[in-house]
Amino acid sequence: MDLENNNNTPLTGKQAEKCAKKRKCVITLDEKQVESKRLKKEESNVEATSRPPAQSPKKRLHLNGKPMQNKDLNFKYGNYKHYYGKRILNKDFHDIRLDVLGTQPDLFRNKQLLDIGCNSGHLSIQIARKFEVKSLVGLDIDRGLINDAQKTVSHLKRHATPGQGIPHIQFVHGNYVLEDDVLLEIERPQFDVILCLSVTKWIHLNFCDSGLKQAFRRMYLQLRPGGKLILEPQSFDGYKRRKKLSEQIRDNYNAIKFRPDHFTEYLLSPEVGFAEMKLMGIPEHCKVGFKRPIQIFTKS
């Protein structure tokens, strides 16, 4: 049959060829659209059958054994921004650990202190002011928390009333665990008291047994004769809840042999050198706090 145009007149050869190409193009486009819809439907069915079931946030972090990006990974050192803030949002909140530390105020008065893992500095500042220390250095691995602590100190100094003494408080960003044990050889005594409150778990999970043992030895070396290490270790039960923060932390957790109930024996051993340990007290916290023993280790 001859091809005709809209006026039912026969088409010329070129016109017929052009029309045929146009029809072929339209048919091809229609076929592609149909094929595209079919593929999308198949993909949708595959996705529906392969999608994992609903899971808790903790389980979603490790689908197929691989850690997913999660905001908790930013806090793998325990550097929670509101670690103390959650406890002081209520102005009536009182950190009961201050009462335990206050049973021996002479340990702090006119002394030079180091607070390892000071977070945003709330407790450090309260200790410095309440017990009239000579100076206090707060150290934390999170630069943002240190910036917050420095701002708090600056605010206190600006708003201090005449005659209101503000102790010399300095906050420093850094990792207390050294890159190499050989650096311990250059340590010199410079503090009367070192505070390590609820920090051992995070050192342990990130730097293994060797990192925590090195930190203990460094604490001893930085204390003057007769100096005190005030230690508030976390129990090993609390480690398990954080082991999924990253694959490295999980591997470190599985490799731990040096348990918290071994800390005292190690600190009193010749490898470290502390002369004695005494229990300072166990805080009786409200439910938003902690109830961990606070120990005092004395350097002979």
Swiss-Prot record:
Enzyme Commission designation: 2.1.1.-
Impact upon substituting T298K: In strain: ZBMEL84, ZBMEL95, ZBMEL131 and ZBMEL157
Gene3D superfamilies with a match to the protein in the record: Vaccinia Virus protein VP39
UniProt feature, compositional bias: Polar residues: 1-12
Pfam assignment, any one: Bin3
Family listed: Belongs to the methyltransferase superfamily.
Database matches in SUPFAM superfamilies: S-adenosyl-L-methionine-dependent methyltransferases (SSF53335)
Function: Probable S-adenosyl-L-methionine-dependent methyltransferase that binds and stabilizes U6 snRNA, probably by adding a methylphosphate cap at its 5'-end. Required for U6 stability, but not stability of 7SK snRNAs, other miRNAs or tRNAs. U6 stabilization is required for efficient pre-mRNA splicing. Essential for organismal and germline development.
Protein name per the record: U6 snRNA methylphosphate capping enzyme Amus
One Gene Ontology biological process: snRNA methylation
Cellular component terms per the entry's GO annotation: nucleus
Major location (coarse): nucleus
Protein residues bound to S-adenosyl-L-methionine: N119, D140
InterPro entries per UniProt: Bin3-like (IPR039772), Bin3_C (IPR010675), BIN3_SAM-bd_dom (IPR024160), SAM-dependent_MTases_sf (IPR029063)
Record field: compositional bias (Basic and acidic residues): 34-44
Claim: Transcription is one of the keywords in the record: no
Enzyme type, top EC level: transferase
Region of interest called Disordered, as start-end residue ranges on this chain: 1-21, 34-68
GO MF, any single term: RNA methyltransferase activity
Result after altering Y84A: Able to rescue early lethality phenotype but not sterility phenotype of mutant flies
Lineage of the organism: Eukaryota, Metazoa, Ecdysozoa, Arthropoda, Hexapoda
Localization of this protein: Nucleus
Organism: Drosophila melanogaster (Fruit fly)
Keywords per UniProt: Methyltransferase, Nucleus, S-adenosyl-L-methionine, Transferase
Deletion phenotype: Embryonic or larval lethal. Conditional knockdown in ovary leads to female sterility, possibly caused by dysregulation of miRNAs and mRNAsso.
